[in-house]
């Protein structure tokens, strides 16, 4: 089964084709993928502008689709099914992918299915060289979500903890903006932190010892106050370069410390030994190194998506779609998107 995956939930236009007949090959069934990022467009505004995101998806979907077909050396008539991101995300952005996918499926007379964006991230590590077996605990950490989930199977998800305010990735973006760094914040803070001392400043770890939920808004406020205290203006771009690097390193260390300790606590609470980490923030090298070190102490293993599948992409949607389509699930012709969609509402496979 060749499944076309479409991802348009935010500011990346991602398309990919997954072929189940090649799942045991080196590429794990991924025939090809194309990705267009709107980072440069939104960097001018310091964050994603929903209307601009939607327009850019519309502009890029058809050219990217044609590029993907050429890359995979197939025709559109060889596609057996289509999976598109149904939610959560920006409603306008979601609608562009959903309408393109549903219309193409109708024209080709093939099934289509809407996929939960975060389920795509959760299942992406299954396309890696060392795929985890169920059950496992998953940390889904991105610009819009921070979730700890006990995954007992596809569609069998138990929410263990989540952010009660800002997501970790969102906190990275806002801290970066305060430090005068461009969007997206995560990679730029990580780069600046390489030259900083992670122990230079003590930042709070909100809710660290209160269950498995997260809170990052207090950490964001602490960074703002720290910048104001160190340079007097509150404008991080005017700070001494070493001070900025130390603040970035201390902030990153505080976020990572919080995430790692919650993961360890979650594994112990549900008596599991496998952790899957996915989402854009999962690419952070300091987070990966700290997780591997701390999980080794409790004889637990950590699994990641392949590097190209950490951020938003069409491959994870194609694979999640394949798993659900082969179980007999599909959607009717009505196009509907869900900007807010709890993972616990998903049907089991």
UniProtKB/Swiss-Prot annotation:
Molecular function terms, GO-annotated: iron ion binding; N(6)-L-threonylcarbamoyladenine synthase activity
Essential cofactor(s): Fe(2+)
Residues noted as binding Fe cation in the record, renumbered to the chain: 117, 121, 312
Annotated EC: 2.3.1.234
Biological processes per GO annotation: tRNA threonylcarbamoyladenosine modification
Pfam families in alphabetical order: TsaD
Reactions the enzyme catalyzes: L-threonylcarbamoyladenylate + adenosine(37) in tRNA = N(6)-L-threonylcarbamoyladenosine(37) in tRNA + AMP + H(+)
One Gene Ontology cellular component: cytoplasm
Functional description taken from the UniProt entry: Required for the formation of a threonylcarbamoyl group on adenosine at position 37 (t(6)A37) in tRNAs that read codons beginning with adenine. Is involved in the transfer of the threonylcarbamoyl moiety of threonylcarbamoyl-AMP (TC-AMP) to the N6 group of A37, together with TsaE and TsaB. TsaD likely plays a direct catalytic role in this reaction.
NCBIfam families found in the cross-reference section: gcp_kae1, T6A_TsaD_YgjD
Family per similarity comment: Belongs to the KAE1 / TsaD family.
Name under which the protein is recorded: tRNA N6-adenosine threonylcarbamoyltransferase
Organism of derivation: Psychrobacter arcticus (strain DSM 17307 / VKM B-2377 / 273-4)
